[in-house]
């Protein structure tokens, strides 16, 4: 099958292209050329910006694909441009959505594909919801099938590991060296990373399998864990000491570090569990890469490419840890002294 991937060089896009090629598909990747890719031989690379409709139109015309996999659409306008260009050419359009589309906190767990999406949790989520709606409105089972996949926290080779204050790789060195790691709240909210190779398998299913058009799919972890467990398991994977976790209330972190806590605001503070049974049944999705194995793979790649920053590249973590410990010690001491 001829498959056209928009954004095939990102973390997840690379995994999807690799699996598509391994499954015997002919793949064309539209990419800006700003990132060195690690795609298999035989992939046709087209340089260009999908935000320029003339570029996308020409690339689709030349490739004449049967299926498009779109990893880089974030709003309704971009979606409608893609629909106008592709609907008379391709048989199926696979759109990479996100679990961000679900309202937080969810009214109940586990979250299914029919759980409420509004009000949006962020501007990013609102854009993705609008894009989904545009694609579903264009769905035609007889000529332009639309499939939407909603991944959660996807990680893997070539990327880093998330933590309360972001995605900087100095977190890894902090874990290794036993330095303070900031954790929001009491560390018991839930999180669920899923390796990109497992997520990519679901995308291949969305390309290949009949009867999946017009549907959305959660493609999510089956190792849901608390944030305390997350850090403990990263440490165990790296043979590091027990992590020095410093628990700081979410609202305090948001107040003192707004630029570092967007993901905390929108996601990390909530306990959410996702139902992925539809993706398993329809797309052949399977969760096969255990989290600690995936951590070792990620860190090995970063080590090989000399991309693990030293722990002290993130002084904010140390400043926050010291300030919070000092203030709580003073607070407790004040009560003990009766002041």
Placement of each model-derived feature along the sequence:
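N-terminal Rossmann NAD(P)H-binding glycine-rich loop of SDR-like oxidoreductase domains
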Residues: 3-23
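Glycine-rich Rossmann NAD(P)(H)-binding loop
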Residues: 6, 156, 184-189, 217-224, ...
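NAD(P)-cofactor binding segment of oxidoreductase domains
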Residues: 61, 66-107, 132-134
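Active-site "gating" loop of Rossmann-like NAD(P)-dependent oxidoreductase/epimerase domains
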Residues: 98-122, 137-142, 159
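Short-chain dehydrogenase/reductase
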Residues: 109-133, 162-169, 192-193, 224
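Conserved beta-loop-beta element that borders a ligand/cofactor-binding pocket
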Residues: 132-160
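Substrate-positioning beta->alpha
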Residues: 163-172, 183-207, 215
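Mid/C-terminal beta-alpha module of Rossmann-like enzyme folds, strongest
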Residues: 205, 209-264, 276-278, 297, ...
